[in-house]
């Protein structure tokens, strides 16, 4: 069983913490219990970390800054109780969704289609990855019967500003407008500034390495992102 459903944004979890806990923690506990005798993969997040150091490994202690991160960290502990189960921490995933408004990359395209400018942080760092690469990695982990904790993310640490520039280069006809900003000045929930993930552990067991976003975009010029 692969469990990737969630209240999946910081803002949504912060505005409705009870729902976030029911979906992210309680539902995970229920599903993990139902899957007690079979392999179970739970999708977690780089936002279980506080972002003070970056390049986090699987052995680093979590320290979430907000309700979303807290619920993911709590759910991880439930899944870890069963040695047959697996936790996959990932980062920003890009691609296309059924609704067209699920991912960071889709938010950018929608803004540009509406001729709106976008303010992107130069001081917040993640390891973005194409969702198809995440799916490939998880499928390989399942087929190899890997259990425990794995970081599955892009091989390149980028700021949101850098990510936006890479994506904008693909959508020049939309006349992308990007301005730099600072996460430390953001008035909303606290933001972890550098949750980049060290992916050495998973790279050592995959048939092909996970690429960085720049590398992936160059190798897949016609793939929507």
Roles of regions detected by a PLM:
Residues 15, 19-30, 59-62, 66, ...:
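Glycine-rich NAD(P)-binding loop of the Rossmann-fold in SDR/ketoreductase-type enzymes
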Residues 120-125, 150-158, 205:
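Glycine-rich Rossmann NAD(P)(H)-binding loop
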Residues 1-23:
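NAD(P)H-binding glycine-rich loop region in Rossmannoid oxidoreductase-like domains
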Residues 1-4, 42, 151:
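Rossmann-fold scaffold of SDR-type NAD(P)-dependent oxidoreductases
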Residues 174, 190-225:
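C-terminal amphipathic/interface module of NAD(P)-dependent oxidoreductases
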Residues 8, 29-63:
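Conserved Rossmann-fold NAD(P)-dependent oxidoreductase catalytic core, especially the SDR/UDP-sugar
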Residues 77-126, 132-133:
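NAD(P)-dependent short-chain dehydrogenase/reductase
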Residues 135-137, 144-189, 194, 225:
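Mid/C-terminal beta-alpha module of Rossmann-like enzyme folds, strongest
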């Amino acid at each position: 069983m692969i469990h990737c459903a969630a209240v999946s944004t910081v803002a949504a979890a912060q505005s409705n913490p009870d729902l976030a806990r029911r979906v992210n923690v309680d539902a995970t506990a229920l599903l993990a219990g139902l899957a007690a005798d079979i392999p179970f993969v739970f999708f977690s997040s780089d936002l279980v970390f506080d972002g003070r150091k970056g390049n986090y490994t699987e052995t680093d202690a979590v320290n979430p800054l907000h309700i979303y991160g807290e619920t993911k960290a709590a759910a991880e502990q439930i899944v870890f109780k069963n040695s047959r189960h697996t936790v996959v921490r990932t980062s920003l995933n890009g691609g296309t969704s059924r609704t067209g408004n699920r991912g960071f990359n889709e938010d950018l395209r929608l803004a540009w289609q509406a001729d709106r400018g976008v303010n992107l942080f130069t001081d917040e760092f993640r390891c973005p990855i194409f969702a198809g690469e995440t799916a490939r990695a998880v499928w390989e982990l399942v087929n190899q019967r890997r259990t425990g904790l794995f970081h599955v993310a892009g091989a390149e640490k980028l700021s949101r500003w850098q990510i936006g520039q890479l994506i904008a280069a693909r959508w020049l006809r939309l006349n992308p407008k990007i301005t730099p900003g600072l996460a430390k000045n953001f008035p909303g929930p606290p933001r972890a500034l550098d949750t980049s993930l060290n992916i050495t552990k998973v790279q050592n067991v995959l048939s092909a390495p996970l690429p960085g976003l720049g590398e992936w975009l160059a190798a897949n010029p016609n793939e929507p992102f």
